[in-house]
């Protein structure tokens, strides 16, 4: 009976490991989607209203999550007169390490360099380019999620089943 319980626990643990890996990919995709939405909003605001950057970043104050605290920090730094490329360093670091999205961090790094140097039209054009890159990354992550998600679940189930049979 104890062997059966141990085998069942191993199988369940392996399934949960597969689900956790799939959940991580889903979270990365959600972060990319939120980031792309933020950059699209920046593009629209820069083109239509010419909204100052500190105000654009400050509008994100009510959003919650790992991504939005560095965005609020960027807004506060921009309001103090810190150059955009230095003000966005916390966001870039969060994307590189906290979210493990180095491609998104590279794209946002390019945007941060453009935000402080060019007029609103050029900044909006850069936002459009960055949105396209983020959308492409999101599509790649979706493909990875569908392919690897199934693979993670199948492999974890198989490994758990083999271990369970060995214990039986």
Show where each model-derived region lies.
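Amphipathic alpha-helices that form helix-helix packing interfaces
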Residues: 38, 42, 67, 74, ...
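Juxtamembrane/interface alpha-helical elements of multi-pass membrane proteins
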Residues: 2-79
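Bilayer-spanning, highly hydrophobic alpha-helical transmembrane segments
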Residues: 5-17, 139-168
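Short, non-transmembrane cytosolic segments of multipass membrane proteins
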Residues: 91-121
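Hydrophobic alpha-helical transmembrane segments and immediately flanking/interface helices
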Residues: 70-94
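Membrane-interface, cytosolic juxtamembrane amphipathic helix immediately N-terminal to a transmembrane helix
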Residues: 27, 33, 113-158
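Alpha-helix N-cap and coil->helix boundary residues
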Residues: 52, 83-86, 103, 122
């Amino acid at each position: 009976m104890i062997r059966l319980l141990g085998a069942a626990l191993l199988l369940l643990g392996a399934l949960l490991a597969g689900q956790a890996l799939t959940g991580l990919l889903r979270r990365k995709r959600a972060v990319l989607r939120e980031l792309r939405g933020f950059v699209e909003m920046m593009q629209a605001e820069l083109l239509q209203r010419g909204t100052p950057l500190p105000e654009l970043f400050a509008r994100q104050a009510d959003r919650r999550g790992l991504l939005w605290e560095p965005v609020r920090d960027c807004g506060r730094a921009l309001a103090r007169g810190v150059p955009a490329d230095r003000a966005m360093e916390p966001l870039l670091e969060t994307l590189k390490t906290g979210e493990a999205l180095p491609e998104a961090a590279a794209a946002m790094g390019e945007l941060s360099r453009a935000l402080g140097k060019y007029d609103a039209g050029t900044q909006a054009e850069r936002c459009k380019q960055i949105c396209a890159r983020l959308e492409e990354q999101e599509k790649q992550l979706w493909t990875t999620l569908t392919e690897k998600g199934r693979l993670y679940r199948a492999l974890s189930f198989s490994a758990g089943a083999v271990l369970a049979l060995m214990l039986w």
